């Protein structure tokens, strides 16, 4: 028995109040150490009822289920009824394969007996009421996201084009502006609807200098090259009329150096009204430029990744928090924004995020706040907002399919680790994103291999989290990684970070569209939406996984309904046998007569 592997953290993803007014408790143990585990629980005040005859704390017992398993750990779960007192004391009764019994409470692991139960310091919940429940965004669990960079998607209003706009078919440069706009998105909403997407995810639309708009100048204005506030409102209404929800990107940790606030600081130094809005080490604010425009040395102020054009904001300042509170409430109240993606949310104070969530819930109880972090794992670090981008798991999936650095067994372990760090009700709202404005394209990560891309996408659509497409994936839109010196001996990284300005424009000519891929995406989204209940609420059970031959199997199960999935990541074909009564939903490189699944093949069947 590995005592160090036994772990429980109360008031976290391992102990929380559910929407069904139950208290979910979880326990982690070393794989195979215990045959059964029970939760012993009761009211904390029951201890006071002991009498001189030696009666101990009155408790009930509930069997735990093993809800996650990998090669390293077993994860156990039970749902405790919340008593009329709204407080629970609990501990764990562990039974090993040799009938040994142990008691795990707050202070230690001991032999299970009534004497130790009487002396035990158990885990005690705070007062449990509905305020402690995480609101589940039911609409988000059924959403398939499509991410759009307005400047690169479609030009629907040439009157708003920037001066000197690039030709739409030119290769992008770091300072490119192509003239895509909000009207262009409106014009092509039917395209997204035909593909089956019901979530529109917009990169920033606020006033900014660049084409990608992550360098915001004014959070209260729509960028003039994208259109007007009226156009944005028209876009949101048009999306809603098609059953789509709209999520907006926002970067709260910095402003552009073109912003009025920063220009005021540059001019007046410490006498500026905004001096305390930023993290300034020394006045006047200055830096030493380098050969790279977005990197500087010897800055006298804090900037994102030493980019002198993105001075960091001071979120300890109440005025900064008030400004952003007004920003979120303004766009949510007046434009009907359904969700917000907070970039670099792991660098924002939890107190501000809680305030933001409370304020927006008053305007719209179903609004969703999503954390996209930079430095934390993203799979368990966010305790305040509604959902996260499961970036670490996304990277594991891409590496497993495209590089082979992650083995099938490693991938299954990663999925279990990701699920263990999140509340069950939160995972279906979390987002799996494989390429983004600051990465190369997924088709490029796949080396241009369409079959590999389709296999990876099919795998992602069978996960619990909501899948997210970057515009143009359905047409194999490609952008090459920045080339390195041929004599350096280094290869470009498949997941290399690069400027969002290098993302290509969408190709709308019919001859440039990929009919096969478009049809495949439509099938995927149809399956995801038809089987949303089993995919978001059902269990995820790993089957056989082989590092030697490179195949993965798993089952998604909800009641009597089952989806069986098999993916071949190896170099040769594998033998596969599906039940006669199974309904084939989607496959690739399946040789039914020979009962074999070819290289980069997959099969998804309903049992």
Model-predicted segments: where are they?
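C-terminal beta-strand-rich structural cap/linker in extracellular carbohydrate-active enzymes
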Residues: 31, 593-607
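Non-catalytic, glycine-rich low-complexity segments
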Residues: 1-33, 116-131, 136
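Hydrophobic faces of well-ordered beta-strands that scaffold small-molecule active sites
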Residues: 144-146, 200-202, 246-248, 340, ...
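Loop/helix patches that line or flank the sugar-binding groove of alpha-linked glycan CAZymes
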Residues: 140, 156-178, 430-436, 441-574
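Active-site-proximal helices and loops of the catalytic beta/alpha 8
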Residues: 236-242, 254, 333, 343-425, ...
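Substrate-binding/active-site clefts of carbohydrate-active enzymes
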Residues: 143, 149-198, 205-329, 334, ...
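Surface-exposed beta-strand/loop patches in extracellular or lumenal glycoproteins
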Residues: 25-30, 569-581
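Aromatic-rich carbohydrate-binding modules that target alpha-glucans
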Residues: 31-85, 93-110
């Amino acid at each position: 028995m590995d005592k160090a592997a036994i772990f429980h953290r109360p008031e976290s993803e391992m102990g929380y109040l559910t929407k069904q007014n139950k208290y979910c408790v979880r326990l982690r143990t070393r794989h195979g150490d215990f045959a059964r585990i029970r939760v012993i629980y009761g009211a904390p005040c029951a201890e006071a009822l002991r009498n001189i005859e030696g009666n101990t704390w009155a408790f009930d017992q509930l069997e735990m289920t093993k809800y996650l398993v990998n090669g390293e750990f077993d994860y156990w779960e039970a749902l405790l009824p919340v008593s009329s007192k709204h407080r629970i004391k609990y501990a764990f009764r562990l039974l090993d394969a040799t009938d040994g019994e142990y008691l795990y409470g707050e202070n230690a692991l001991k032999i299970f007996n009534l004497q130790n139960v009487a002396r035990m310091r158990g885990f005690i919940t705070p007062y449990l009421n509905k305020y402690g429940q995480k609101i589940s965004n039911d609409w988000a669990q059924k959403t398939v996201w499509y991410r759009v960079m307005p400047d690169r998607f479609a030009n629907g209003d040439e009157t708003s084009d920037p001066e000197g706009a690039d030709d739409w078919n030119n290769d992008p440069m770091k300072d490119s502006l192509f003239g895509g706009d909000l009207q262009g998105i409106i014009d092509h909403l039917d395209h997204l609807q035909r593909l089956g997407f019901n979530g529109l995810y917009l990169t920033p639309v606020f006033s900014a200098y660049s084409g990608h708009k992550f360098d915001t100048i004014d959070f209260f204005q729509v960028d003039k090259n994208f259109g007007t506030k009226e156009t944005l409102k028209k876009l949101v209404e048009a999306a809603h009329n098609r059953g789509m929800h709209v999520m907006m990107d926002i970067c709260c940790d910095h402003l552009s150096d073109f912003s009025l606030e920063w220009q005021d600081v540059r001019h007046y130094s410490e006498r500026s009204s905004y001096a305390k809005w930023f993290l300034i080490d020394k006045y006047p604010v200055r830096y030493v430029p380098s050969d790279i425009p977005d990197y500087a040395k010897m800055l006298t102020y804090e900037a994102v990744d030493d980019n002198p054009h993105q001075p960091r904001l001071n979120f300890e300042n109440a005025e900064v928090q008030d400004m952003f509170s007004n920003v979120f409430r303004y766009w949510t109240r007046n434009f009907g924004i359904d969700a917000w993606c907070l970039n670099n949310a792991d660098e924002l104070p939890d107190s501000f995020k809680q305030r933001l969530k409370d304020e927006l819930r008053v305007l719209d109880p179903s609004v969703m706040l999503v954390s996209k972090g930079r430095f934390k794992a993203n799979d368990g670090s966010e305790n305040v907002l509604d959902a996260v981008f499961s970036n670490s798991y996304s990277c594991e999936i891409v590496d497993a399919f495209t590089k082979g650095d992650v083995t099938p067994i490693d991938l299954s372990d990663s999925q279990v680790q990701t699920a263990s760090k999140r509340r069950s009700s939160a995972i279906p709202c979390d987002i799996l994103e494989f390429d983004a404005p600051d990465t190369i394209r997924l088709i490029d990560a796949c080396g241009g291999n369409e079959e590999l891309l389709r296999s990876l996408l099919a795998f992602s659509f069978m996960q619990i989290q909501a899948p997210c497409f970057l515009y143009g994936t359905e047409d194999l839109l490609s952008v090459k990684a920045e080339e390195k010196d041929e004599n350096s001996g280094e290869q470009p990284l498949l997941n290399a970070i690069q400027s969002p300005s290098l993302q290509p424009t969408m190709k709308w000519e019919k001859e440039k569209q990929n009919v096969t891929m478009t049809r495949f995406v439509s099938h995927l989204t149809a399956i995801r939406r038809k089987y949303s209940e089993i995919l978001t609420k059902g269990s995820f059970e790993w089957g056989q996984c082989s590092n030697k031959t490179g195949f993965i199997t798993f089952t998604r199960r909800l009641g009597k309904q089952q989806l069986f999935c098999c993916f071949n990541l190896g170099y040769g074909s594998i033998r596969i046998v599906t039940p006669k009564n199974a309904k084939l939903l989607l496959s690739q490189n399946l040789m039914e007569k020979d009962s074999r699944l070819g290289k980069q093949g997959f099969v998804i069947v309903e049992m």
